[in-house]
Each structure stands twice: as C-alpha cells, then as structure tokens.
UniProtKB/Swiss-Prot annotation:
Residues that bind Zn(2+): 140, 144, 218
Name of the molecule in the record: Protease HtpX
GO cellular component terms attached to this protein's record: plasma membrane
BP terms from Gene Ontology: proteolysis
Cofactor note: Binds 1 zinc ion per subunit.
CDD domains from the UniProt entry: M48B_HtpX_like
Family: Belongs to the peptidase M48B family.
C-alpha cells in the first residue's frame, strides 16, 4: 500500500512540476502557481482520502448492510467460511462480511486497506445464484481487495482532482485576461464563471479517465476471482448476471467495486465503471483457451 502511495505521489509531483514549467512559459505568475498547486493537491487528495477512510462506514450506512458477527443460518456460515478461505488464499486479512437488502444480484468490497476491508452481498444474489456462482462473486470481490483497487482508485482520483482544479484556474485566468485585456492577473466576476464551467468540462474528462481505469481493474478482478474460485464458476457467475441484469442500486461510492455495473451504448459507455458482461466473459474464455 505505502509503495503504491509513494509512487503515485512521486508521479503526481513530477507532472505538477512539469505543469509549473509549462505555465511559467505561458507567463503565469510562479508565486501564484506554487500556491495554486499546493491548494489543488490539498483539496484534490484530501477529499479523495477522506472518502477512502470513511468508505466502510458510508457503505454500511448507505446500503443498510448488516455485518455477520455470529452466523445464524447455514448461508451466513457458508459466506464467512468462503470469504475466509479466499482471503487466506489471496494473502489478506479477514474482511468483515455483510448482507444488505436488495433485489438485484450484486456484491461489493470497500475499505482503506487490504487488511481492514468489507465484503457485502445482496439478498438478491443469495436468492438467485447457486453456491458455485456466489463463490466466484466473492472471489471477484476479494481480488479487488487483494489488488488494492480501493487505494489505487483513491490515488488516481486525487491526481485527477488536482489537475482539474489547477487547469480550470490557469486556463480560466488566461481566458479572463484575454477577454478583459488585463495582463496583470486581475480577476473579474467572469473569471469565476469561466472556472466553474471549465471545472465541469475537465471534470467530465477526469471521470472518463477514472472509469476507463476502473474497467481495466474489473478484468483483473475477474481473473482473480477465476483463480480463487475456478474459471468455470467465474464465467457462470457472469452469465447469470447477464440473464438477470437489472438497475444498479448501489451507492455511487461503491459501484466501481461491485460485481455488476451499468449498461450503456455510445458516449454513455465512457462513463461506466464496468465493461459489458459479454466482454468480461469473452476475456475469461480467451484466457482459458490460451492456458490450454
């Protein structure tokens, strides 16, 4: 975890330094630029990491997930035993296991680190999947935890937030100066309107980047689930999802780490956290064929 954080911070620092050089060549005041970079990094990473640290609490609160402390039914006992087996195989600490009330077939994982995670499944999943399929879904979620996807996505979001804040203000300042004829850095009311509009536009592009990365992580989590539970079980689980694919009612902060995502065509696909189920199934089958 700490190696990943160090690498992301180092990368972010290098890119921000490059941005500072470029902006200085464009005539942006270096003193103002330094303050802007610091402010952007604080707000960009601050919000992202606060969300990460509160992710388990917010997920439980928003879904009404009930953590299983003492199993009361054979199903709850099986859930705990399966998650424990997958966690041991993946080399991570035992996550909390919870069930939340929801008709859709879904599950999610969240948490600030690999050894303090939460894995939750919907009642719809327990009612509509057999144990082999559910085992594969749990393997998929454990793979998310083992791969450190929650931390990685928080770091990526921090980098993107930082760039949105910086670029919106730098470009907004240049546009405002050009429109007003003021080259001394004065700020009129129009500047704040321009910055707000640019943050919306750049934010859309940042979301596309984050969702593209999330889709890549889904393929990797599918492969991890196949390794933990078996490739045929993982394929069967995804096929079951494709037959019972409904609206994703998970809260936005955990949708990226669920087993099931939304459906969309055209531009909408750019904002999906999950690849189409057909592509995920095809990837698993292709990997199975190449391994033979």
């Amino acid at each position: 975890m700490f190696n990943r954080i160090f690498l992301f911070l180092l990368t972010n620092l290098a890119v921000l330094m490059l941005a500072g050089i470029v902006m200085s060549l464009l005539g942006v005041n270096p003193a103002q630029m330094s303050g802007l970079l610091v402010m952007a990094a604080i707000f960009g990473f601050g919000g992202s990491f606060i969300s990460l640290l509160l992710s388990k609490f917010m997920a439980k609160r928003s879904t009404g997930a009930q953590v299983i402390t003492e199993p009361r039914t054979p199903t709850e006992r099986w859930l705990l035993e399966t998650v424990r087996r997958h966690a041991q195989a993946a080399g991570i600490g035992m996550p909390e296991v919870a069930v939340y009330d929801g008709p859709e077939i879904n599950a999610f994982a969240t948490g600030a680190n690999r050894n303090d995670a939460l894995v939750a499944v919907s009642t719809g999943l327990l009612q509509n999947m057999d144990q082999d399929e559910a085992e594969a879904v749990l393997g998929h979620e454990i793979a998310h935890v083992a791969n450190g996807d929650m931390v990685t996505m928080a770091l990526l979001q921090g980098v993107l937030n930082t760039f949105v804040i910086v670029l919106a203000r730098v470009v907004g300042g240049i546009i405002d100066s050009a429109l007003s004829g003021n080259r001394e850095g004065g700020r009129g009311f129009a500047y704040y309107i321009i910055v707000f509009a640019l943050e919306m536009v750049f934010g859309l592009f940042a979301t596309m980047i984050a969702m593209w990365f999330s889709r890549r992580r889904e393929f990797r989590a599918d492969a991890g689930g196949a390794q933990l539970a078996g490739r045929s079980k993982m394929i069967a689980a995804l096929e079951r999802l494709s037959l019972n694919h409904g609206q994703n009612t998970l809260p936005s902060q955990v949708q990226a780490f669920g087993i099931s995502g939304g459906v969309g065509e055209g531009l909408r696909r750019l904002f999906l956290s999950h690849p189409p189920l057909t592509e995920r199934i095809a990837a698993l089958r292709a990997a199975s064929g190449s391994a033979m």
